Amino acid sequence: KLGLEQTRELFRRIGSPERKLRFIHIAGSNGKGSTGAFLESALRNAGFRTGFYSSPHLVDVNERFMINGVPVDDNRLAEALDKIRSAADAMKNENGMRVTYFEATTAAAALLFAGAEADFAVWETGMGGRLDATSIVTPVATVITTISMEHKEYLGDTIGKIAFEKAGIIKPGIPLFLGRSIPQEAYTVIAARAKELNASVIQPPEAPENAELIIENGIPYQTFDGRKTRLQGRHQRENLLLAECVLRYLAEQFHFDFAKAARGFANAQWSARFQVLPGENTVFDGAHNPECAEVLASTLKEVYPGEKFDFIYGTFADKDCTAFLKTLVPLATSFTFVKVDSTRPSRNPQELAALVHAFAPEISCKEAELKTALEAKVPHRKVLCGSLHLCGEALALRRQEKYIPTRY
């Protein structure tokens, strides 16, 4: 159920923890998590105590609630959820209100961050913005990263309608930081709403087309214009420049050293976004819509020029697979199709193979279990994509097999 009335009531019953926090509220079709990860890492590098609320999680629900870059522990999370359960039960008994899962996790995040006395909370929307549970807060800055066709059954069937929903995070007099690659139709809607609310609109400069790839202590970084990040691809250059705009504003408003904070961008990590585990020859990427496929293809060509890839792909039944797969076919030597382990219907691997063969009959396609596909010996680099949920499954399998010294 979308809406804010019961979210406000839930927060009131748990003591309004949001009033103790300074929020940076981030919406967007793609890039929310990466932009948030840049900001969280930079603020922590400046010496601030940070909270970072994001979704979905990949392996453990604790990942949604990061305090100083570390997932909250089970005991603290259970304590917060117990308090929320008591409030939710009372709301159901007294008013017939049924608190949703996302409302509960959003309230838990506010409780946990307030309890940890976080200086800043990086606060990611779940879906849309206007009616999203995260939107009950009054932030110190708002951010909209990108707009594309997604969740059409909830947000609308045009870019303009989706932009209107995302623009719901804009608050009176609070500056909006807007991604550079916003479509014109979306920009018009968002700028009009910002003007109504007397909110200034700030955009970063264009990201450079190219960057230099360097390796430090076995970790690949891209560098450009004196900046350095582990996150690969032009889209991550765009996300970093957007985060940098926000950080510069925060440094002016809250009087901290911008240069020291900005050095934290180099430490930012965001799992299943062009992630390569130590000693692995597999790229894990949660790309799940046609726009993401274009970004993935572009990044593969930039980081591994001239290479072909063996793709492992699985997705949900409601996704636009044709456009996604068409984008990847020119880079593919083969596709292995897997089912996503979820209560949501998964796209049938045989249907996916038929889709590929309809426009690329020469490409090898097969079906396999995820574990088998990951372990298969192939002559080319493997790329796992199609769903963040699928990446979570794969990373969970890897966690059982070896220690991974990275957050996911």
Q: Residue ranges of each PLM-predicted region?
A:
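C-terminal helical cap/extension that packs against the catalytic core
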Residues: 181-202, 217-218, 281-282, 325-383
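A conserved segment at the C-terminal end of the G1
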Residues: 26, 34-51
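Beta-strand->loop->alpha-helix junctions that form or flank phosphate-binding loops
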Residues: 53, 178-181, 193-216, 230-234, ...
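Glycine/aspartate-rich loop-and-adjacent alpha/beta segment that forms the canonical ThDP
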Residues: 388, 393-408
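Extended acidic/charged loop-beta regions that coordinate divalent cations
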Residues: 105-154, 187-227
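Nucleotide phosphate-binding/pyrophosphate-handling subdomain across enzymes
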Residues: 20, 115, 120-125, 132-143, ...
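ATP-dependent carboxylate-amine ligase catalytic core
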Residues: 4, 9-19, 45-137, 153-155
